[in-house]
Amino acid sequence: MSSIVDDGISFRPLDIDDFDKGYSECLQQLTEAKFTKEQFIERFNQIKKQSDTYFLIVAVDVKLNKIIACGSLFVEKKFIRNCGKCGHIEDIVVNNNYRGKNLGLRIIEQLKCIGSQAGCYKIILDCSEANVKFYEKCKFERKGVQMSIYLPTPPKL
């Protein structure tokens, strides 16, 4: 995916230098996302080694050189559907100061395109009830019920 610049906003893959451009701060508007630069670099390098599985996109305010939105696609390799692939969209967030500019929609559209190019037979996501209308605008439909269990944090070795 090449960088797309529109209205002073660039859309591109996550880069190793993005910790210093506010990636953590952007994610924190979605959920708890505190991590050190060292943790970011370690995880970034792990993800980079699986470039056919993980696709992380950021939107950058070019003037401020600051990340203002992000999202990710994880491609799950399955045995069902003739050893098909299922895309999972995760961690869609737009900085509060930039909402209403269709940035989330544009990130979703790019992730859907990546999923299609990766050969996914479907793309799924989980969202809160408050975000259903947004994802319907992105052409997603309600399907099934989400279930989850949060596990305790394992002790550090």
UniProtKB/Swiss-Prot annotation:
Annotated disulfide bonds: none
Principal EC category: transferase
Similarity field: Belongs to the acetyltransferase family. GNA1 subfamily.
GO-annotated biological processes: UDP-N-acetylglucosamine biosynthetic process
Organism from which the protein derives: Dictyostelium discoideum (Social amoeba)
GO molecular function per UniProt: glucosamine 6-phosphate N-acetyltransferase activity
Alphabetic keyword roster: Acyltransferase, Transferase
Record pathway: Nucleotide-sugar biosynthesis; UDP-N-acetyl-alpha-D-glucosamine biosynthesis; N-acetyl-alpha-D-glucosamine 1-phosphate from alpha-D-glucosamine 6-phosphate (route I): step 1/2
N-acetyltransferase domain mapped to chain residues: 9-157
Catalysed transformations (reactions): D-glucosamine 6-phosphate + acetyl-CoA = N-acetyl-D-glucosamine 6-phosphate + CoA + H(+)
Cited CDD domains: NAT_SF (cd04301)
Annotated acetyl-CoA binding sites: G100, K101, N102, L103, G104, L105, Y135, E136, K137
Repeat is among the record's keywords: no
Protein name (record): Glucosamine 6-phosphate N-acetyltransferase 1
Binding locations of substrate: T31, K78, F79, I80, R81, E90, D91, I92, Y121, K122
